[in-house]
Amino acid sequence: MYLRRLRDLREDHDLTQTDIANLLGIKQTVYSRYERGYQNIPLEHLLKLADHYGVTLDYIFERKD
């Protein structure tokens, strides 16, 4: 599931949820809800995360390794 991939990317880069929330301009609690699947992640945020991690959306959505 892509939510697991987002968490793995964050942890692989030694970042906290607060770090990513700051990057996206949102509260940590909102980002936590994204990672846990309680709130949909806007496409704008997914694109920003993909750029930040240097990966494609296909990679995030596990369409490509």
Question: What do the PLM-derived regions correspond to, one by one?
Answer:
Residues 2, 6, 56-57:
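Hydrophobic side chains within well-formed alpha-helices
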